[in-house]
């Protein structure tokens, strides 16, 4: 009878330890993920700073054209073509 209680007691300890182990494992995993994300954010910020410096080094006219993006002008292209054709007729 004592051996049965000993086995049950050891099984209870093993189950308790395994749940705690899983919790600790999950916490470590979350901490590692957070550290990786922080490092990536720092790298992205450094990259953005470097790009901004390169843009500021360009000539003023080139900076002006870089600010004008194709996406901003794209909706106006069909209207410009119609006006161009209208002016030719």
Swiss-Prot record:
The keyword Membrane applies. Residues 19-58 form a propeptide. Its main location: secreted. Residues 1-18 form the signal peptide. Keywords: Amidation, Antibiotic, Antimicrobial, Immunity, Innate immunity, Membrane, Secreted, Signal, Target cell membrane, Target membrane. GO terms for cellular component: extracellular region. It is found in: Secreted; Target cell membrane. Disulfide bonds: none annotated. The keyword Secreted applies. This is Arminin 7591. It comes from Hydra vulgaris (Hydra). The lineage of its organism: Eukaryota, Metazoa, Cnidaria, Hydrozoa, Hydroidolina.
